[in-house]
């Protein structure tokens, strides 16, 4: 049994089963569980052989915490069917992480080759599906009209850029070794494959890279500096000790420069009534959800509905994600899940950096360098595009991390034949668990009322979103018929105010519930309290402004609704809508407000 488990082909079979499981959840989710169970067979065989079921890594406990918060995120989600698929894609991502980290060094070349194939396949997919006519140019229009027609969904060019960068970096190991080999009679075929493949990947890279060219320049300069420092570390012990810290400092500088530039970019490509649509604006608005759902998270796949319903207050989807990998994780899985994922990424960079200056093998050092570059791209580019935690891309969430851990973990069995976790790994795990626990204990001890208020507000917000967003988007405003279904959420939110009367989350949502009941005086009181605490929250501004309209206080309403460009058109619709609801008085208020917002209509 141990001969089978120790064979390099067993590790590749493990990886193949995990890839099949992930593909099943993407293409045929009805049979996904069956494929996931099959993917666990290598774990069972390792256990029967006397080994641990999976390869131990320094971040195992954090991975476990991340998985637990993902399960909690499924419970909290308003769309259970979408959340069910996503939680299993996360499980597939974790299985991929352990399948990659367990690969022996002999398989590194084949894994790099798979990365090249993925980059090539993604490039072909992009060329066959993207609307090049929309970006102008004769060639783009010609290609869009004459290429083979495929009825596949297009992938955003920013997502393609990130995935190609990561996979191409990891593929470089195979490309480098392949160019030095002789293939005999197959040389011509292999050379054509390499040239055409690299040409296709390079073409797509050029087509998608224009907006971040200055960041790439800084990226290259920083890498050269780090490379020179790593050479010095061979003869200077102090340089070797501080090298991981230098890498993290470089990462911070790169993120700062990147966010000062591309953060102002417009992910929706057009400015409209709902704001600047910049990443900086999305980061600010998304941050409010971190305050609403700090403990459980808002639920898997919840950002689109939350942003539309509670931030811009419209009955249809606007953004599918926050264009920020780490923000999306923290929103959907809470502070604990978000912190766990961030620490995993930073720990991986630290550990790989250590291996670069400590590993004497040039071959393994090169693989570690490539892993480090892929991790840096994942983190920096993940601050601007979320393709690793959105849709089918979720299955690749731990792909760069798993490749990085290949050069970090120790796969040598002990004398008893059982793989044990190195002492250093245990110390890292203990520190990663102890510090957050101490922080939580300190938080509870300092202000228990604040914590209880956060808990009830979080729970009430989850209960409310599960009712209001059950069939979202409907394309229509909710009516008072929904109010009775929100009684449980209302009771929970009132409990939050008993511990902290200024809890913004509870006051905002209680105000929305009172508006549904058409109790506008109570709604105004709650919304005013919330507005005092967070005067820049767009959802609160809009809801309070509308509440003032229904109360007939047009002057106060105008002060707020002047900040909401779409209010003018929506008020015109409300003139008709309130009339159909049997409230001609509110229809008249909407008409008065329309005149204020659009003086030309008078």
Predicted regions and their residues:
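Transmembrane signal-anchor hairpin modules in multi-pass inner-membrane enzymes, especially those
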Residues: 1-72, 78-82, 92-109, 113-117, ...
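Alpha-helical transmembrane segments of multi-pass inner-membrane proteins
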Residues: 2-5, 14-21, 35-44, 71-72, ...
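Flexible juxtamembrane loops connecting transmembrane helices in multi-pass membrane enzymes
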Residues: 142-148, 250-291, 308, 457-471
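Membrane-interface segments at or immediately adjacent to transmembrane helices
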Residues: 280-292, 448-513, 522, 529
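TM-adjacent membrane-interface loops and short helices in multi-pass inner/ER membrane proteins
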Residues: 280-319, 326, 333-340
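Canonical positions in the second alpha-helix
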Residues: 495-496, 529-530, 560-564, 594
């Amino acid at each position: 049994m141990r001969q089978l488990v120790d064979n390099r082909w067993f590790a590749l079979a493990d990886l193949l089963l995990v890839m099949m499981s992930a593909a099943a959840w993407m293409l045929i989710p009805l049979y996904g569980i069956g494929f996931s169970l099959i993917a666990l067979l290598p774990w069972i065989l390792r256990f029967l052989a006397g080994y641990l079921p999976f390869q131990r890594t320094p971040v195992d406990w954090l991975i476990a915490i991340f998985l637990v918060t993902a399960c909690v995120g499924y419970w909290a989600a308003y769309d259970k069917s979408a959340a069910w698929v996503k939680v299993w894609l996360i499980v597939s991502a974790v299985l991929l992480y352990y399948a990659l980290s367990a690969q022996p060094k002999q398989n590194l070349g084949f894994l790099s080759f798979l990365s090249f194939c993925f980059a090539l396949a993604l490039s072909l997919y992009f060329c066959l599906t993207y609307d090049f006519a929309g970006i102008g140019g004769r060639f783009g229009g010609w290609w869009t009209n004459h290429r083979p027609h495929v009825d596949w969904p297009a992938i955003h060019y920013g997502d393609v850029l990130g995935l190609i960068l990561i996979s191409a970096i990891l593929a470089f190991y195979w490309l480098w070794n392949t160019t030095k080999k002789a293939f005999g009679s197959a040389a011509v075929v292999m050379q054509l494959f390499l040239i055409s493949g690299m040409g296709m990947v390079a073409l797509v890279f050029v087509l998608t890279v224009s907006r971040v060219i200055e960041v790439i320049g800084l990226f290259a300069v920083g890498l050269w500096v780090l490379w020179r420092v790593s050479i010095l570390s061979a003869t200077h012990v102090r340089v070797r000790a501080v090298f991981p810290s230098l890498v993290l400092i470089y990462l911070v500088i790169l993120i700062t420069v990147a966010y000062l530039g591309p953060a102002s970019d417009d992910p929706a490509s057009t400015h409209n009534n709902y704001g600047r649509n910049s990443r900086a604006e999305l980061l600010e608005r998304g941050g409010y959800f971190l305050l609403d759902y700090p403990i459980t998270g808002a639920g898997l796949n919840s950002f689109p509905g939350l942003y539309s319903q509670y931030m811009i207050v419209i009955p249809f989807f606007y953004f599918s994600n926050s264009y920020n990998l780490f923000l999306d994780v923290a929103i959907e899985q809470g502070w604990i899940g978000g912190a766990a994922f961030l620490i995993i990424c930073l720990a991986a960079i630290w550990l790989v950096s250590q291996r670069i200056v400590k590993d004497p093998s040039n071959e393994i050092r090169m693989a570690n360098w490539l892993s480090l570059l892929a991790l840096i791209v994942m983190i920096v580019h993940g601050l601007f595009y979320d393709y690793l935690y959105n849709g089918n891309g979720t299955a690749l969430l731990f792909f760069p991390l798993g490749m990085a851990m290949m050069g970090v973990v120790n796969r040598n069995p002990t004398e008893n034949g059982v793989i044990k976790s190195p002492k250093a790994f245990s110390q890292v795990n203990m520190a990663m668990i102890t510090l957050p626990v101490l922080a939580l204990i300190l938080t509870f001890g300092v202000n228990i009322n604040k914590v209880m208020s956060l808990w009830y507000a979080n729970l009430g917000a989850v209960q409310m979103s599960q009712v209001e967003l059950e069939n979202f988007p409907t394309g229509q405003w909710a009516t008072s018929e929904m109010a009775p279904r929100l009684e449980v959420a209302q009771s929970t939110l009132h409990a939050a105010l008993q511990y902290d009367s200024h809890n913004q989350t509870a006051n905002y949502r209680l105000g929305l519930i009172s508006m549904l009941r058409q109790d506008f005086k109570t709604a105004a009181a709650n919304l005013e309290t919330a507005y005092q605490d967070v005067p820049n929250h767009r959802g609160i501004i809009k809801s309070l402004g509308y509440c003032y309209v229904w109360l007939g206080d047009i002057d106060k309403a105008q002060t707020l609704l002047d900040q909401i460009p779409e209010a003018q058109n929506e008020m015109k619709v409300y003139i008709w809508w309130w009339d159909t609801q049997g409230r001609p008085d509110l229809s008249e208020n909407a008409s008065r407000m329309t005149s204020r917002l659009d003086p030309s209509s008078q």
